[in-house]
From Swiss-Prot:
This is ATP-dependent protease subunit HslV. It comes from Ralstonia nicotianae (strain ATCC BAA-1114 / GMI1000). It catalyses: ATP-dependent cleavage of peptide bonds with broad specificity. A double ring-shaped homohexamer of HslV is capped on each side by a ring-shaped HslU homohexamer. The assembly of the HslU/HslV complex is dependent on binding of ATP. Its EC number is 3.4.25.2. GO terms for cellular component: HslUV protease complex; proteasome core complex. Pfam families: Proteasome. GO terms for molecular function: metal ion binding; threonine-type endopeptidase activity. NCBIfam families: ATP_dep_HslV, PRK05456.1. Belongs to the peptidase T1B family. HslV subfamily. One of its GO terms (biological process) is proteolysis involved in protein catabolic process.
Length: 178
């Protein structure tokens, strides 16, 4: 059976602000199943932003596990991410989950993959999903050539990705922390 997939998630950090946004499209094969999905949210009493790309059910499972790890480590983002990545890589059931997460708090942004990677992106920009490369390129250009706030960079980057990637639409959810 085909998986639901296709999305763009992008995060931008500048100064003491971070923004994380995603589009709303859920695709099954070559059919758009939903255009208003919410793949970005705040957790841990509004102190952590999280966005996910990949198979929807897998992403929700990982999101729940990440939130539990945050509780376990009292909001310490890196420790929670590393513990989740270890479980994801070593647990036989979790190993087959097909999703990626971007998580961010006031201090850091991390990309968590199913390969056990916890990546601290360079330049304050992270992007995942089918339109991730488009959004990341756009965000990099905007960060280097404008003084736009992170939220505006995220929105413009998602718009560009939505114009180029068939698995990305222009119904955005953007969350920020200051």
């Amino acid at each position: 059976m085909e998986q639901y997939h296709g999305t763009t998630i992008v995060s931008v950090r500048r100064g003491n602000q971070v923004a994380l946004g995603g589009d709303g499209q859920v695709t099954l094969g070559n059919i758009v199943m939903k255009g208003t999905a919410r793949k970005v949210r705040t957790i841990y009493d509004g102190k952590v932003l999280v966005g996910f790309a990949g198979a929807t059910a897998d992403a929700f499972s990982l999101l729940d596990r990440f939130e539990a790890k945050l509780q376990k480590y009292q909001g310490h983002l890196l420790r929670a991410a590393v513990d989740l990545a270890k479980d994801w890589r070593t647990d036989r059931a979790l190993r087959h989950l097909e999703a990626m997460l971007i998580v961010a708090d006031r201090e850091s942004t991390l990309v968590i993959t199913g390969n056990g990677d916890v990546l601290d992106p360079e330049g304050g920009i992270a992007a995942i999903g089918s339109g991730g490369a488009y959004a990341q390129s756009a965000a990099k250009a905007l960060m280097e050539n404008t003084e736009l706030a992170p939220r505006d960079v995220v929105e413009k980057s998602l718009r560009i990705a939505g114009e180029l990637c068939i698995y990305t639409n222009t119904n955005f959810v953007i969350e920020t922390l200051e």
